[in-house]
């Protein structure tokens, strides 16, 4: 590649661009990520120019063949973008000029870098959305499989990080399934707004050349076409919406990771994360750290930062295009890659995580989380719920003070709190009975969980 770096816009200026200013403004180290999208967009644009007789067919052929060769050069590493090229668009056009001469300049007929980069970004977003949706599909599949495998395993359900009520482990996994299903729906809905071609808007006011924007749209397989050329190049709301969707996905992963970190700790000891997804300590030999889960939790903050960066970049920009928008690429690329890789590694880790069923079974059977069953037992005996709650609270205090458990407390002792208690109370205090007593829609009963599993499989 030639050592002389030509800036595409420099002819109007009498002094060369300051070298340090060029280094400061160069984005090629970041936007080289878009080289495939940029070449795809250029090939479509040149094809349209040829079909509309704006450039000769033979010149279009040379340009397209040159672009295809450049794509191969970049992908194999034989063409390495340099910061002096300013951006990936300049890298490609300068290399094309080296290959085919001055006719390379016709690639930009009727096109600005404004609609060029807007097109590249939308193509990148379409690909990113599909990749993350595929990763979510794989995660949802594992969640349903886990729900089915553990549908009759009883664990603690928590509120305020306090043991609350016994639930089916399958019910727990399906809760996260539904969260990630909504994440998928958000991306699916966003795709419709991304799938709109901005090519043909030029700088922002359109072009005097007889461009066929509809043909460019079809060649690039966009569903829709921009309505307003200013809007087409000057907003980045689709990036903000995408990074927001990524932030919500990461938030759900982070909450899930927190559960796994806590539940795999010695203090909880409810589940086992495979050694393949844990690390040890360089000084404490006994340690097994849930590092992958912790990293997912930590990377969530990065994606939140990407969202804040995008909102801040755009908040004060007048119409239409401003160079500030160059700074949309780092948060976009980081959010996309971080979210995709986090979903994928979390899926692998979850697939290799197992619940300690025997330990949980013994813990749940004697736990105070069965107290709600006592209150509802009294309600079924026609006691007002507030009174039942008060009576049960006193029973819980007695159990704590006496060191007994709810199932082990005698009927005689129960009757000191209310004469409504009878032998059938002990049936209600069995964890499986507690779980299966739930009658409402979407609840934790085994029958309800099995229905939810069937429904979930249709939504993978």
UniProtKB/Swiss-Prot annotation:
The keyword Oxidoreductase appears for this protein: no
Gene Ontology annotations for the cellular component aspect, listed alphabetically: cytosol
Pathway where this protein functions: Amino-acid biosynthesis; L-arginine biosynthesis; L-arginine from L-ornithine and carbamoyl phosphate: step 3/3
Alphabetized Gene3D superfamilies for the sequence: Fumarase/aspartase (C-terminal domain), Fumarase/aspartase (Central domain), Fumarase/aspartase (N-terminal domain)
Keyword terms: Amino-acid biosynthesis, Arginine biosynthesis, Cytoplasm, Lyase
Disulfides per UniProt: none
HAMAP family for this protein: Arg_succ_lyase (MF_00006)
Protein name in UniProt: Argininosuccinate lyase
Species this protein is from: Prosthecochloris aestuarii (strain DSM 271 / SK 413)
Gene: argH
């Amino acid at each position: 590649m030639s050592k002389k770096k030509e800036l595409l816009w420099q002819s109007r200026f009498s002094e060369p661009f300051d070298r340090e200013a060029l280094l400061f403004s160069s984005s090629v180290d970041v936007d080289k990520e878009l080289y495939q999208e940029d070449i795809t967009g250029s090939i479509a644009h040149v094809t349209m120019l040829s079909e509309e007789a704006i450039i000769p067919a033979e010149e279009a052929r040379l340009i397209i063949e040159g672009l295809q060769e450049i794509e191969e050069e970049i992908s194999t590493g034989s063409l390495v973008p340099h910061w002096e090229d300013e951006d990936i668009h300049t890298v490609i056009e300068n290399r094309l000029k080296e290959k085919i001469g001055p006719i390379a300049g016709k690639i930009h007929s009727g096109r600005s870098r404004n609609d060029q980069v807007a097109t590249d970004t939308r193509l990148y977003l379409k690909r990113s959305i599909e990749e993350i949706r595929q990763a979510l599909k794989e995660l949802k599949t594992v969640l349903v499989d886990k729900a089915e495998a553990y549908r009759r395993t009883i664990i603690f359900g928590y509120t305020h990080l306090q043991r609350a009520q016994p639930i089916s482990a399958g019910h727990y996994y399906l809760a996260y399934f539904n969260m990630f299903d909504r994440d998928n729906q958000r991306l699916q809905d966003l795709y419709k707004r991304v799938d709109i071609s901005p090519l043909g808007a030029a700088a922002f006011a359109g072009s005097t050349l007889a461009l066929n924007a509809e043909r460019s749209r079809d060649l690039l397989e966009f569903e829709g076409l921009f309505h307003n050329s200013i809007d087409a190049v000057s907003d980045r709301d689709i990036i903000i919406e995408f990074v927001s969707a990524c932030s919500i996905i990461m938030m759900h992963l982070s909450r899930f990771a927190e559960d796994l970190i806590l539940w795999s700790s010695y203090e909880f000891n409810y589940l086992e994360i495979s050694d393949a997804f844990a690390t040890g300590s360089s000084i404490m030999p006994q340690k097994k750290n849930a590092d992958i889960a912790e990293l997912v939790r930590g990377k969530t903050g990065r994606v939140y930062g990407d969202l804040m960066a995008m909102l801040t970049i755009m908040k004060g920009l007048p119409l239409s295009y401003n160079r500030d928008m160059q700074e949309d690429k780092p948060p976009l690329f980081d959010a996309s890659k971080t979210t995709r890789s986090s979903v994928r590694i979390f899926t692998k880790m979850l697939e290799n995580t197992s619940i300690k069923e025997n330990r949980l079974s013994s813990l749940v059977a004697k736990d105070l989380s069965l107290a709600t069953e006592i209150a509802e037992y009294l309600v079924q005996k026609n006691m007002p719920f507030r009174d039942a709650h008060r009576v049960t609270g006193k029973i819980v205090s007695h159990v704590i003070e006496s060191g007994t458990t709810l199932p082990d407390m005698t009927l005689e002792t129960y009757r000191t709190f209310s004469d409504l208690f009878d032998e059938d109370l002990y049936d209600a205090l069995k964890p499986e009975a507690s779980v299966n007593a739930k009658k409402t829609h979407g609840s934790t009963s085994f029958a309800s969980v099995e229905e939810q599993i069937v429904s979930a499989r249709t939504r993978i």
